[in-house]
Swiss-Prot record:
Residue ranges, annotated region (Disordered): 143-185
Gene name, Swiss-Prot/TrEMBL: FYV10
Function: Involved in the proteasome-dependent degradation of fructose-1,6-bisphosphatase.
Annotated keywords: Cytoplasm, Metal-binding, Nucleus, Zinc, Zinc-finger
Segments of skewed composition (Low complexity): 163-174
GO cellular component term, pick one: GID complex
Boundaries of every CTLH domain copy: 203-261
Protein name listed in UniProt: Protein FYV10
């Protein structure tokens, strides 16, 4: 690496702007929460002092005055503890910002000194930071194994706050507890390297928890809590995350045939989206009618055991009169108790005449992946974090500068009854040392553009064999000599082996190539 050609410190600061943007946003949130807390408690204390002032004017109210005074003192002490907690959060955030400023000041000093070794050490630490970021985002979070074994139904709510500054810092601090059986490897690696102040891993842990709950456990509780806490931001950005989350909650209730809760969810949370998502609501209502027909068309569907309570609720919605009573709190005008309609039979007849494929799509588990992507985009956008992993972005940039049109084309040796020969050709002759073609980087390189190479490297003596394959003549002769020496192939001194086609050719079969 040339120190002279290395990017400037300003370039690195712009590239890693989120390292300062995130704590700045958390500081703003913490300040707003402090202000709300002070305003709320100040109003309550003001009323208490007014009441105390009224009581002390009458000597007969001395006991009441003392009781109220003690209550005021307790309120002030509680306020002091809460404010102390907020101040500690602010100090931690300021400590992060200070550490990051010093980190890039160190880079500036290294560049000015021109010390190559120290520069490489700085880049090694930066690489460790990228690795920690990737592991924190994508690893299993603490206690996930326990949660995945829970018998709680998918729509259940987990009452916890996950994105306030104080709760995130508290959650991150709890990772130091040695009694915890599951620790995020990204956070562990970050602390081992002494870089924990350079990455807002508490923010990443929060999104990791919610994301894994969605994709692995199909649990909506943490996401719904986060949506409620950040409703103002989601409304400001016109995000449809709340609708999709509530829609999925409705679908989960319908799946387990808890129609009463499904209808309540529809009335409480989905009706307000009537004007923005009318077609989706129409489809949601249709799912309630065709759910049994959809299940009968899904061969892999395993029915969920219903609780006694759900079975009891089911019996309440068996007729037209029952639906009218539930929705409109009255019976239809044409209702006659002596003439009940068999709704199940009519539903089967209706399902036969309706394309239920669009309703079956609502039961697809891929909806959880879609919901997870929508959440990640909203979450990362709120904090100004890159949606894509920074480590993969850097790798993609490096790989695309090496990728040529010859990459990712697998070369297989011919199948030979001589296993020793096949092994030698595969491991020694046709082995591709190109990093772009390696199993680790090939998936990343698939969709990347080719590099604009301005130089070409040609064989010194290119020849084409009758098979159409082109090789370096001297390397073919050296390979033939090695094969004869190892007694892997029986051939004459004037013959060579095509390692791809597996045919033996004489030297006189060479066709000299002239690149133009």
């Amino acid at each position: 690496m040339s120190v002279m050609n290395e990017p400037t410190v300003d370039f690195h600061l712009k590239l890693n702007e989120q390292q300062f943007h995130i704590p700045n946003e958390l500081l703003k949130r913490n300040l707003k929460q402090c202000q709300k807390l002070i305003d709320k408690e100040a109003t309550a204390l003001e009323k208490s002092f007014e009441e105390l002032d009224r009581l002390v004017r009458n000597p007969q109210n001395d006991e009441s005055s003392m009781a109220l005074l003690n209550e005021i003192i307790q309120k002030v002490e509680r306020l002091e503890r809460k404010l102390t907690k907020r101040v500690n959060v602010e100090l931690q955030l300021l400590q992060r910002i200070d550490a990051r400023i010093k980190y890039y000041q160190q880079l500036d000093q290294i560049k000015q000194s021109g010390d190559r070794n120290r520069l490489l050490e700085w880049y090694q630490s930066y690489t460790n930071l990228l690795i920690s970021d990737y592991l924190t985002r994508n690893s299993m979070y603490e206690g996930e194994d326990d949660i995945s074994c829970s018998s709680t139904p998918p729509p259940a709510r987990l009452k916890r706050k996950l994105s306030s500054a104080s709760s995130q810092l508290t959650t991150a601090t709890s990772n130091n507890d040695p009694d915890r059986s599951h620790v995020n490897p990204g956070v562990e690696y970050l602390k081992q390297q002494g870089l924990d102040l350079l990455l807002d891993y508490d923010i990443l842990l929060t999104t990791n928890r919610i994301s894994k709950q969605l994709t692995i456990n199909h649990e909506l509780g943490p996401l719904l809590d986060w949506i409620k806490e950040n409703a103002t931001y989601l409304k400001h950005t016109s995000s449809m995350l709340e609708f999709e989350a509530r829609f999925q909650e409705y679908i989960e209730y319908v799946k387990v045939e808890d129609y009463s809760k499904a209808i309540t969810c529809f009335q409480t949370h989905l009706v307000k989206f009537l004007y923005s998502n009318p077609l989706d609501l129409q489809q949601a209502a249709g799912l309630l009618v065709f759910i049994k027909a959809c299940k009968s068309n899904i061969s892999s569907y395993v029915p969920t055991p219903r609780h006694e309570e759900i079975v009891k609720q089911q019996t309440l919605l068996q007729s037209k009169e029952d639906f009218w009573s539930f929705f409109f709190l009255k019976l239809p005008k044409s209702s006659k108790k002596d003439h009940k309609t068999n709704i199940e039979v009519k539903n089967n007849e209706l399902a036969a005449s309706v394309d239920i494929k669009r309703y079956m799509e609502l039961l697809d588990d891929r909806r959880w992946e879609k919901l997870n992507e929508m959440f990640l985009k909203a979450y990362y956008s709120m904090y100004g974090i890159s949606y894509h992993d920074p480590l993969l972005i850097y790798l993609s940039l490096g790989i695309s500068s090496l990728k040529t049109k010859d990459c990712l084309h697998e070369r297989r040796a011919f199948v030979s009854p001589n296993n020793e020969l096949s092994e030698f050709l595969s491991s020694e002759v046709l082995r591709n040392a190109c990093p772009v073609c390696s199993p680790e980087f090939a998936p990343i390189a698939q969709k990347l553009p080719y590099a604009h190479q301005v130089q070409s490297r040609l064989f010194e003596n290119p020849v084409m064999l009758p098979s159409g394959n082109v090789y370096d003549a001297e390397k073919l002769k050296a390979l033939a000599q090695t094969l004869r020496k190892r007694k892997l192939v029986v051939m004459g001194e004037d013959e060579v082996l095509d390692p791809i086609a597996g045919h033996t050719y004489a030297l006189t079969d060479f066709i000299t190539m002239y690149p133009t």
